[in-house]
Regions:
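Positively charged n-region of N-terminal signal peptides that target proteins for export
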Residues: 1-6
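Concave beta-strand-loop units of leucine-rich repeat
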Residues: 21-143, 147-165, 169-187, 191, ...
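Bacterial N-terminal signal peptides
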Residues: 7-16
Length: 294
């Protein structure tokens, strides 16, 4: 026992030194060990990015930082993301007259034809919402969809009433099930040819030149194509095009005679689910909810 006592005494003396060596760091009254992997700033809003960076520079092992009380503009997000590529940040994004947490799975601007519009640059901040599965940015001035490359898990996408000409980024969204593209300036549908999970597609009022890319989408349940090759109500889609699509897609309900939102487009159980999910910021799977809605 006498031999153990000096050893225990030595361990007691070394313990404070070990703790001191490990160390802690404090920011906005939040104290964490320097070897932590997760930081939650809670209700503390960051006002000084330089001070935040000085804090994070002392945490070499951190991989997740939640700071949802801080409203972040695009330039601030870019600055932190570039400096700390190893860290996943939880932010509240601020763009236009909207705010959105980066952990949201659904988002809609809830715009109509009288709402103030936002540009592609405004929406590019959404690339930080990696978990988004449903997105509605209809009734805006979107002409560049590049930011969609960072949202590979989208299942519902509404881009109606914008200025889109190039839909190439849509080819990177293999999980898409519902897609509204009406009232844009789209000519080439090729990027849609690989979307084998797509159930609902609305391309009314565009400038489509070739419909062949749609002929392989045999899983489609609904396809709205009224005036999809022009904007003139007096020049209907050629009957030959309609016949070709009906032959290629015998199990698809194809509507070539009704306006983009008429003919039952918004009277389907899946639209009811979409309306419900965009009332909040949480994605609702169609299969799970349709039975309830019906």
């Amino acid at each position: 026992m006498k031999k153990l006592f000096p050893l225990l005494l030595l361990l007691m003396m070394l313990a404070p030194a070990a703790l001191a060596e490990q160390g802690t760091v404090t920011f906005l009254e939040v104290t964490v060990p320097t070897d932590c992997t997760y930081v939650d700033l809670g209700a503390k809003a960051v006002r000084d990015l330089d001070a935040l960076e000085a804090f994070l520079d002392q945490l070499p092992q951190v991989t997740q930082v939640d700071m949802y009380a801080t409203k972040m503009k695009r330039d601030a997000c870019d600055r932190l993301a570039q400096r700390y590529p190893q860290i996943t940040f939880g932010w509240t994004l601020s763009f236009g007259d909207h705010t959105l947490r980066t952990d949201a799975t659904a988002f809609s601007t809830l715009h109509n034809n009288k709402s103030p519009t936002h540009s592609s640059q405004d929406f590019s901040i959404l690339k930080y919402c990696k978990n988004l599965q449903a997105l509605d940015i209809g009734h805006n001035k979107v002409d560049d969809l590049t930011f969609l490359y960072d949202l590979p898990h989208l299942k519902v996408l509404i881009l109606a009433c914008n200025a889109v000409t190039d839909i190439t980024p849509l080819s990177s969204l293999p999980e898409l099930e519902y897609l509204e593209l009406f009232k844009n300036k789209i000519t080439d549908l090729t990027p849609l040819s690989g979307l084998t999970r797509l159930k609902d597609l609305n391309i009314c009022f565009n400038k489509v030149k070739d419909y062949a890319p749609l002929t392989g989408l045999t899983q489609l349940e609904r396809l709205w194509i009224y005036n999809s090759d022009n904007y003139s109500d007096t020049i209907p889609l050629p009957k030959s095009v309609v016949s070709m699509l009906k032959d290629a897609l015998p199990n698809t309900h194809i509507d070539s005679t009704h306006y983009s939102t008429l003919g039952g487009w918004r009277e389907h159980p899946r639209y009811d689910v979409i309306y419900k999910m965009f009332s909040g910021t949480e994605y609702i799977p169609f299969d799970a909810e349709e039975a309830t809605v019906q």
